Amino acid sequence: MEAFLRTHRYLVEHVNAPVRRNLMNEINWNDRLIGIKGTRGIGKTTFLLQYAKEKFDISDRQCLYINMNNFYFQGHGIADFAGEFYHHGGRTLLIDQVFKQPDWSSELRKCYDLYPNLKIVFTGSSVMRLKDENPELNGIVKSYNLRGFSFREFINLLTGNDFRPYTLEEILEDHEHIIKQILPKVSPNRYFQDYIHHGFYPFFQEHRNYSENLLKTMNMMTEVDILLIKQIELKYLTKIKKLFYQIAEEGSKKAPNVSKLAHDIETSRATVMNYIKYLTDARLLNLIYPIGEEFPKKPAKVMLHNSNLLYAIYPIQVEKQEAMETFFVNTLWKDHKVNTGYRDCNYIVDGKMKFRILDTHQMQRMKIQPDVIYARYNTEIGRGNQIPLWLLGFLY
């Protein structure tokens, strides 16, 4: 136990978290079992250590961070370790990469039943279905998703500002006033393209080639997260990677040709749809459906999950419009439902709001529809039903 406590103190003391993630405010920390899911490289470890640093003194033995990558846990279960920690006065156990432990869900259930005064916060892959696939945790675990940096968090990090998030309703009703609070302090256009290119994943702060780092992370998502958690044989990995690349290469302008994709990777249509779902769970893809439809039906659009992925896979041929629409869907995806639009709009949000994403210069030769919200790029200001696209990056 002493060795784990020493490691905990060292990690908490040296954690580098220059921006406080908004999820920290959204979690009800009074719950006894909290699961934090997120894609690889999104900052889950830093988030746990940041929580420990905020809530506990560094020498407080009531809180302990452990990582299931530690070889110690190849011969010791979570419940036994938690019991020893509890009997030594421990009350908050932070478990990183919980899925690396066999029978992790039943072990967590045992902890929950045996130690009513012990709080457990654990992290896992976005591919995990915490409640659907682990019935023993149903009703007792509170699940949250840690996302990549929003444009707001990115700007706060680079400029030292502390801009707050806004709801979609606030932005639509009061965007002209909100913009007046932001523009005197920062020029969003100076940072927006950088964010689109490399601002979503926290490791952009590291002094390494970002695209290479992201490609390695994407490979780990498919090789470890999807194969390990979904228990897929290694021989199918090349099919999943080839499918992902073909979808990325084709872009999102038309619905995927599932029959052609199945032929190209030599598998069935049903398997293609399953692979697409796994890639979506891994936060590599977003599926866009017409209103009233959902998986397992064929989506109307398959998009990359965030714009950074576009530049990592196909940097020379990224179309500006595709990058902007990818940003739009990704930033709204957290709290809103996005469906394909009609003739006069790109997307329907929450079943009622019509959005069109376009270059501000296109507005000069268009008839403005009063029931459409125009999210414009290449501008910092808005008026009426025309809002600057970058401001949607302040939703979280």
Residue ranges of each PLM-predicted region?
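Hydrophobic anchor at the beta1->P-loop junction of P-loop NTPases
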Residues: I36
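Interdomain motor-coupling "hinge/lid" segment immediately C-terminal to the ATP-binding subdomain
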Residues: E2, H8, S125, K131-I240, ...
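Structural recognition of the conserved hydrophobic beta-strand(s) that form the central parallel beta-sheet
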Residues: L94, K119-S125, N145
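Conserved lysine of the Walker
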Residues: K44-T45
